[in-house]
């Protein structure tokens, strides 16, 4: 990274930390510094009222560029465009398609379809649901289906049928048997069967470089009352468990890792939420 210059600040006298502290104490007029100005976070550390350059000495990752380890600024190197996504529950295929087309006209470029968990969707069903929705332009995500393998096969076959350019297809299936075990106390089918499904999903997704098939849903932990640290710990542990179990089944880490998608809960505590996403990128890297 280029070294920062101070050309704009040459006329301003540097202010020592001790001078800041002296001024703060004066303005407090005897009030307790710790109680008034120090934020005691639920994550177990105290946030000071201000920070200075010396506080970030040694934090080399702050100088990293997007696309470089440890990826705290993401992996995109040409732009930083984010998908704008809207979720919708699919009760009726035609009505869901109409709603999807309507919101796409309003600027949405990512769709999250929450499917009937018990229904096995055919290629014809997906044709109705995704009519006039172009997978090379719109990110298409499926949530909730217990028949993830059949869904993936049918979606992939439809992409082939319509000659979609696989390198431009973005989306996800979000199959999460560990999440199912955590929230429901049981697997979709069985431990062995669900992990075998994960493996087969990854094998199909090998043709779709921007389509992820395994979802780690940190929102489950967030909504159960986990702190930021706990949500990160539980989510990353689930990710590591998928890596461990699936590499034991013959897949390489390079097969598995790119196919895992993490979702985290976001609250009104924005600074901590931003820190959580950056920390997740760093720890997973």
Predicted regions located by residue number:
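Extended amphipathic alpha-helical segments enriched in small hydrophobics
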Residues: 273-285
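Catalytic alpha/beta active-site cores
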Residues: 1-269, 273
């Amino acid at each position: 990274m280029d070294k920062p210059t101070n050309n704009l600040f040459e006329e301003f006298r540097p202010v020592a930390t001790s001078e800041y502290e002296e001024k703060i104490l004066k303005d407090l007029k005897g009030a307790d510094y710790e109680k008034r100005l120090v934020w005691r976070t639920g994550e177990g550390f105290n946030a000071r009222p201000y920070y200075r350059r010396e506080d970030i000495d040694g934090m080399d990752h702050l100088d990293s560029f997007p696309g470089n380890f440890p990826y705290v600024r993401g992996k995109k190197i040409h732009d930083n465009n984010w998908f704008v996504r809207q979720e919708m529950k699919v009760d009726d295929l035609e009505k869901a398609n109409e709603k999807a087309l309507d919101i796409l006209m309003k600027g949405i470029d990512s769709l999250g379809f929450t499917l009937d968990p018990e229904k096995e969707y055919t290629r014809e069903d997906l044709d109705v649901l995704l009519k006039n929705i172009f997978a090379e332009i719109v990110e298409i995500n499926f949530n909730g289906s217990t028949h993830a393998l059949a869904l993936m096969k049918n979606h992939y076959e439809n992409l082939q049928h319509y000659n979609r350019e696989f390198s431009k297809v973005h989306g996800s299936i979000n199959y999460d048997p560990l999440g199912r075990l955590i929230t429901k106390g049981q697997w979709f089918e069985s431990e062995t069967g669900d992990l075998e499904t994960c493996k087969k999903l990854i094998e199909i997704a090998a043709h779709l470089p921007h389509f992820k098939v395994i979802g780690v849903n940190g929102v489950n932990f967030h909504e159960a009352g986990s702190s930021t640290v706990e949500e990160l710990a539980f989510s990353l542990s689930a990710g590591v468990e998928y890596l461990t179990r699936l590499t034991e089944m013959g897949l390489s880490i390079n097969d598995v890792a790119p196919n895992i998608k993490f979702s985290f809960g976001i609250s009104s505590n924005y600074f901590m939420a931003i820190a959580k996403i950056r920390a997740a990128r760093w720890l997973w890297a």
